[in-house]
Amino acid sequence: MSKKLHIKTWGCQMNEYDSSKMADLLDEYQGYTLTEEAEEADVLLLNTCSIREKAQEKVFHQLGRWKTLKDKNPNLIIGVGGCVASQEGKAIKDRAQCVDLIFGPQTLHRLPEMIEQIQQGGKAVIDVSFPEIEKFDRLPEPRAEGPSAFVSIMEGCSKYCSFCVVPYTRGEEVSRPVDDVILEIAQLAEQGVREVNLLGQNVNAYRGATHDDDICTFAELLRYVAAIDGIDRIRFTTSHPIEFTQDIIDVYEDTPELVSFLHLPVQSGSDLILTQMKRGHMAIEYKSIIRRLRKARPDIQISSDFIVGFPGESKQDFADTMKLIEDVQFDHSFSFIYSARPGTPASDLPDDVSLDEKKERLAILQDRITQQAMRYSRQMLGTVQRILVEGPSVKNPMELRGRTENNRVVNFEADPKHIGSFVDVEIVDVFTNSLRGKFIRGEDEMDLRRDLRPSDILAKHKKDDDLGVTQFIP
């Protein structure tokens, strides 16, 4: 009987990416297959996130439920990974004796050895170190799971915003070598991937080493990826305003594969609050970036992150945030009520905005952005949009579901043969969370660009390197 693995994931897209790599790793090296049912599993892994309030308590509640499974099956292995594990490693083990292994985001590649150690009767393992980019060197080849894929290009963040735990849980910024990134994307393209989403806590800080000891910037990486045949859409998340430089904006002007949609977190529209947050920029500088982006790509749509009720946020500070939202006309947001994260500088500030006031401000902000998003959706009525078809519609499996460049879900009727490819549809109806389309044409009637075949890239990858180093030489 095959060994079963169950992974529960909380948090950002980077965590989703990490969880997929854990599954690939344990499948390749130890033969574990994924199961949706925790009761069936031989190994349970919890990939945690420390961004939201009471993250630690959420972890212990989940571990309490899993403990009942371990009481029935003493051989069950329970592991905790992610940012809460990195931050609270020993405390987790002290409080939850059922946990066998604790690992951080940078040590997930060591999971096979950790599990083997436990199976051989070893003590509980705690490894939350920061071995820089080592984890990427030991992961198996990527496996496509549809036409869209996430590819991590860097880890960590060195900005140290006063409210954020990421530098403490994922370490400082470390970029993957550009050869490794291009090779992974080429492998995915060979498997039918058409869209890549480049991941990192701060992707525009990317500075990847090249084969000749030079440095590849994020703007250069975007152009390399755009040249790969079959990759017709590029997204990235997340970026920071202070490193959104002109060379990146220039890519929007001449690289159509880069989508007309950008998630650029601002957090607040108040200069006072931005200073308290240690964001490193003012509201006018953020708006300057947006103006230059819209000059390069007039139809680009912007989403952002907002924190309401940050310590010291006055009614005027919140009004400044609402003014920024109106000026920029954001299309979407991830917005949260402020709650202190242990160990961050902001946790020492007096939390002087009442919970009721925070809730009211959040509701006002979200309502405004929802109105703006609906206005953008209505403007799409009657237009023809290029859709990447992801699979059957969630609500009606007889229909197909795809995504526009500006990240809207479109449901429409068409032949299932179009799954995994691009189609053009006319937008005929608008709903709060989706659009309805009418099929116009398939990919065989489009003139899609062909530059550099993935097989050409893979052919340049010398698999028998004596040093065990992989290289892609453009």
UniProtKB/Swiss-Prot annotation:
Its EC number is 2.8.4.3. Binds 2 [4Fe-4S] clusters. One cluster is coordinated with 3 cysteines and an exchangeable S-adenosyl-L-methionine. SMART domains: Elp3. [4Fe-4S] cluster 2 binds at C157, C161, C164. InterPro entries: Elp3/MiaA/NifB-like_rSAM, Methylthiotransferase, Methylthiotransferase_CS, Methylthiotransferase_N, Methylthiotransferase_N_sf, MiaB_methiolase, rSAM, rSAM_horseshoe. Residues 378-441 form the TRAM domain. Residues 143-375 form the Radical SAM core domain. It comes from the Bacteria. Monomer. This is tRNA-2-methylthio-N(6)-dimethylallyladenosine synthase.
